[in-house]
Amino acid sequence: NTYSYAAAEVIIPHVLGGNLMELLTLQTSWQSVCENTELMVAFGGLPAFNSQISNGGTGAHIQRLGVIEAASAGTKFINLSPRRSDVKSDIDEAWYTLRPNTDVAVMLAMAYQLLTEDLHDDYFLNKYTEGFEKFQAYLLGQRDGVPKTPAWAADISGMVEEDISALTREMAKKRTMLTVSWSLTRQQHGEQPFWAVTALAAM
């Protein structure tokens, strides 16, 4: 497995089917983001300094321009990262700092809130996913006695409870795209952010 996203390579076939390399060829274009995305929530940010790396020669590094164009088209960017610079600084973006390795706690709290406030998409979950009832039980604390509330996640992540709640409600109201930096796989339990964000997006 590659160093860049080894944990994702392992978990993605079990969560989405296929393999990660195939899925990478289907990534969303910046043009599509500009046309369809009202809110982009970036776990780990969108650091331009190491995006679109090339194995050799020169590559077309379009992310910086893509972010600017999307912001100009009305996309609001949310940077969830310890570093503010993980999203281009000259666009209007909101930054919420998280303790390293705590992104999944915030994702779970968002999923909990979508569930308990009836903001989730039952039709999509029933038609296109399997096993949501087990995930639901985990979110509600039926398996371990710990409901995955925004207050629970705030204590772990350092993100303010009210900010988690407000952002979750905003995500439910708008056409939202969730992104996860490959860097989140390079930590203990690095497969979990990709699994959790897939479940959150499905909701």
State what each model feature region is.
Residues 3, 46-49, 83-86, 184-185:
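Solvent-exposed loop/turn segments at secondary-structure junctions
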Residues 1, 171-203:
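A glycine-rich, hydrophobic/aromatic-adjacent loop/helix-cap motif
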Residues 59-73:
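Catalytic-core regions built around general acid/base machinery
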Residues 47-61:
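Glycine/threonine-rich flexible loop motifs
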Residues 1-36:
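Anionic-ligand anchoring segments at beta-strand to alpha-helix junctions in alpha/beta enzyme folds, i.e.
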Residues 71-78, 83-173:
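Long, well-ordered, tryptophan-enriched scaffold segments
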Residues 7-9, 51-55, 88-93, 107-111, ...:
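Short acidic, glycine/serine/threonine-rich loops at helix termini
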